[in-house]
Every structure is written in structure tokens, then in C-alpha cells.
Amino acid sequence: MLTCFFHAGCSQPMHQQNTFSKQDTLRGSITPERSWWDVVHYDISVDPDFATKSITGETVITFKVLEESGLPMQIDLQYPMKIDSIWFDGEMINKNPAYTSDITKNFYFIQTPGFEKGSTHKIKIAYHGIPKEANNPPWDGGWIWEKDMQNRPWMSVACQGLGASVWYPCKDHQSDEPNMGATLSVRADKDQVAVGNGRLKEKVLHADQSNTWVWEIKNPINNYNIVPYIGSYVQIEDDYTGESGKNLSLNYWVLDYNKSKAEKQFEQVKPMLNCFENWFGPYPFYDDGFKLVEAPHLGMEHQSAIAYGNGYMNGYRGRDLSESGWGKKWDFILVHESGHEWFGNNITTRDIADMWVHEGFTSYSETLLTECLFGKKAANEYLQGIRLLINNDKPIIAEYNVHQEGSGDMYYKGSNLVHMIRQMINDDDKFKSITRDLNKTFYHQTVSSSEIEKFIIEKSGIDFSKIFDQYLRTTDIPVLEYKIDKQKIRYRWVNTVKDFNLKIKVDTGKETWLSPSSSWQVLDAGADYDGQKFKVDQNFYIQLRQKH
């Protein structure tokens, strides 16, 4: 996902609240009706009707039984979408009622025939309706019904936060990705192309000359990342040889009149992939390829089919978010959404309360890309510039099990946190080994923030626990207070959690590392100290305050 800048009409996908409903728990937790079964594969078929803004479809969910609970199966499908029929292993359910729903008609509880632990089964659900329309995608989610510049239908979906159940029935929780991937079949008119995640498996011609485009995803994938794009697309093909020597197919599906622009702008892809593979390890989805798809919205990290809508220009819609000058030297949407292939798609948080793992590390990929192309000084200036976007309005980590995101500061406060960890490690090779090992150790897995925090602490040999608490779980920015008395500099932390232990680099005429605490400590600056200079390295996101 990307946060919202310079756009008066946009809002964050989820809003923090103090009280939660039963529906928040049904959406955000692993309920008993979810816990007894594990998703193995999704087979999604959808036929959209542009004229009526409606869809009909079928979803087949292959699942494994984890426990013989005797409980119903919770399936999520958001109102006003409606279930028509349900089959288990090819047998239609004839019970009346076959299911019940909650008061919002977003959550269905389906009676099952009863299954043995360890067995694998299929549920097929036929459904139809007019899905929620996205009024301001991607921040306001739903189905997108637009027309291109030549007045031709152009359709897609953006549903992170809102949930994939806005348009197809599923277990709508990040913790349960289909272990064996998914298939997405999309019907489109004869003069339109339907693009999906993964690789094109087949194209089926119908009597009315429409086509069903069948896309196969071999890797685990987040529900919200499975997305169709339907438009007047042409394909640009290329390939990339990664650091392991493997060949990665590159495919760019763009509106026909933008082909030449895309060919030029997407020359940035290979240098970007070189940089990200160097810092994060091999691209995580070689089997499914790398795609950019022109979208009727700004952009999203749809796995192996990244939504691109930045107008073939550098920066964020032509703006440098950092105001450093470096943010206009590369395409923000291309870089940010591609960075999510490692953090967000390869490594996925089980609860959206921990989404900083997606957004903080991915936002730091922007700094790393700047470093790869223009050097460390440029990267530091970009990183420091994006602090302008930090609000410190609420904690980055939110409430668990109620489908609640934390502050939008998860992006650039999160990025600054990662950068400070790098400074404290003070060894770029070691830091790189950690970012690469994260993607290797948690390859295609769902995680919690605490697991990521523990991993970094163990691999670095540095106890960052209080630093994580400070920047992720409070809104307070550490303040380094200091007093100068001739050649003596007294210093301490205030506005911090107990036992806060951020080690920082300062300049008193010479570079010095300090390990402040909440108690006053003394630095002897030396006989040649002029009693004036005391600066904190700008790579640390803290406040400095002199006491007199």
C-alpha cells in the first residue's frame, strides 16, 4: 500500500478507534469458525459487467482440516454481494438454511457435512452482486469502473484494508495465505485484455467472441493481492538475470496508447531489481514472474502484477516527497510498490496491526534505491527529508485481533527506525545480512512484529527492544538534553520509555558515540573543545535540547 500525500480527497484505509464491535472481531481475529481449517488454494472465476457495475462469479477454496470441531465454516463476503449456491466436494448443500450470517451480512457461517482431521476438501461458492465501488482508489477500496482516455472500459480492484471479500468469498485474514497459490479466471469482451497475477495459463474463446483469461499463481499470496485488470492493454516483454543466475520474466501490460512512454519509464526496473536483490536477496516470486500493470489508480503492491498509475513520471505524481531533490530522480510508485514484493508479499504480517513491517521496510527501500543509484550522502538526505511527513499522531502498532491499522507513520517513521538500527549496527555488511536473512528465514511466511524484532535483536547482537517500544508503541520522540560547562558536556535522555538505550553519534569537533540514559552523564570533550559545537548525527530521528 502507499500512504496518501498531496491529495485533498484521500484518507487512510483504516481509521483508529477506541471501541470495537463484534464485527471488528469477526474480521480481525481467527475465530473458532476460522481456526479449524487452513486454506490450500483459491480458484476464482469472475465475469464483470461494466454496464451494470455488477459481477457474477464462483470461488473454489481447497482447504485442509486442522481440527474436528463440528463448528460451521466462516466465509467472508461483503454486502451487497450475495451467495447463490454452495457445494462441498461436488455435492450441493440442500440444508435449509445452508448458512447463517451476522447482522451486517458480511460474514457467513456455513454448515459442513463434518470432516476428519488431516483431510483435504473443496468448497465451491457461486455468488453475484454489485460490489462496493471505490470512490477514491486505492485509499477508498472496492471495484473500479473507469474509462480510459479513448472512452473504453477500464476495470480493476483495490481492496487492501477493506478486504478481498468485497468482491469474492474467502477467509479474509492475512494470516492464512493459500499454500499452493491460486488461479484467477476473468472474462472480458473480445477487444479487451484481462490481466491477473502470476502467469497466463490459457485464454478460452467463447461463442460471443469474449475470452476468459486464466492466470495461475504458484506461490502463496495475500487475499488482497489477487486482483484482475481489464482494459485495452498491450504487452511489453523483457527479462532479467538475477544475482543467482536465474532468468526472471518481465512483463509490462500498459494501455495501448502509452506503450512508448512505458518502454522508456520502465528502463528503471532492472537497476532497481539489482539494488533490491543486493539488499534483500533474490526476488521472491521467480515462478510467477514480475509484472507491472497500468491501473486506473495510483498504485498497489499486487504480487507479481504490481498496479502502476504514476503517469510515467518520476517522483510521487511528479513531486519529491522528501524535498531533498533526490525523490524526483526515480519513479516513486515503481520503486515503492516493487519493494513490497519482499516486505509485504514475501514477508506478510498476520495481523494488520503490525503493518509497519510492510511499510517501514518498504519505505526504507526508497532510501536504499537512492543509495544504490546516487550514493550514501544522497540516501541520507532523502531519508532525513521524509521526516517532514511524520505526524506522531498515534502509535504505529495498533490493537490486535480487531482489524485495526496503526498510524500512517508506519511508513516514514518506520523507515527512520530501520535506518537508526543500521546506524547502531554500524556495519553495512552485517545490516545487509540481516535484511537478506529476514527474507530467507521468513520466506513466503506470515509473521508478527515481535518475531521480526526478536530476529533483528538476535542477529545483530544488540538489544533494540526498548528502541522498538519507543518508536512503534508510543508517539514520543526521544529528547537528548545537554548542558555545556567549559570542556564538559552533560547529557541524558528524556521523553522516553524506561531503560531507553539508543546509542547515538555526535560531533563535538570530532566524532563520538554516546550511550545516554535517563541519568545525567558527562563527556569530557577535551582541552581543545571550544564549548560551542555539539551536534547529533542527522541519521538519528531524535530531538536535541540545550539546558542552561
Predicted regions and their residues:
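A surface-exposed beta-strand-loop module
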Residues: 78-146, 208-211, 524-528
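Glycine/proline-rich low-complexity spacer/linker segments in large multi-domain proteins
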Residues: 17, 30-31, 117, 126-182, ...
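Beta-strand-rich binding/interaction modules
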Residues: 82-88, 195, 464-465, 480, ...
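Acidic/His/Gly-enriched intrinsically disordered linker/tail segments
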Residues: 218, 355, 359-420, 442
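Hydrophobic helix-coil surface modules that form long, contiguous segments used
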Residues: 57, 160, 171-335
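N-terminal, polar/Ser/Thr-rich
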Residues: 10-56, 84, 93, 146-153, ...
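Solvent-exposed beta-hairpin/edge-strand motifs
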Residues: 70-95, 187, 191, 505-513
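Amphipathic alpha-helical substructures
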Residues: 284, 407-489
